[in-house]
Amino acid sequence: MSLGTEEKQNLINTHQVHPTDTGSAEVQVAMLTTRISKLSTHLQGNIHDFSSRQGLLKMIGQRKRLLGYVRSKSEKRYTELIEKLAIRG
C-alpha cells in the first residue's frame, strides 16, 4: 500500500520541523503510520495475505525504532508526535 504524491506532500507539510524538511523522523513516522493503517485495513479483508502481513510487521518495527530515536532526542517532540498521530493509548 503506497502513498500518492499529494498524500505524501500533505503529510510532509503537516509534520515538517522546518520549511525545507522532507525526511525528519517525525515525517517518516507520519508516513509509516498512514501506510500501516492502510495495510491493516487491507489485511482485515485478506486474512491469508502473509507477505503483506510480514511487510506490516516490518513497518511497525521501523516506526518503533524511529519513535525511540525521537524520544531519545526530545521527550516533548515525542509526546507531541504521539498526540498528533493518535498512536498510543
Curated annotation (Swiss-Prot):
Source organism, top-level taxon: Bacteria
InterPro entries the UniProt entry points to: Ribosomal_uS15 (IPR000589), Ribosomal_uS15_bac-type (IPR005290), uS15_NS1_RNA-bd_sf (IPR009068)
This protein's UniProt keywords: Ribonucleoprotein, Ribosomal protein, RNA-binding, rRNA-binding
Gene3D superfamilies with a match to the protein in the record: 6.10.250.3130, S15/NS1, RNA-binding (1.10.287.10)
Family matches, as PROSITE patterns: RIBOSOMAL_S15
Keyword Secreted: no
GO molecular function: rRNA binding; structural constituent of ribosome
Record-level GO BP terms: translation
Gene Ontology CC: one annotated term: cytosolic small ribosomal subunit
UniProt feature, compositional bias: Polar residues: 10-23
Assembly: Part of the 30S ribosomal subunit. Forms a bridge to the 50S subunit in the 70S ribosome, contacting the 23S rRNA.
Listed name of the protein: Small ribosomal subunit protein uS15
Species of the source: Prochlorococcus marinus (strain NATL2A)
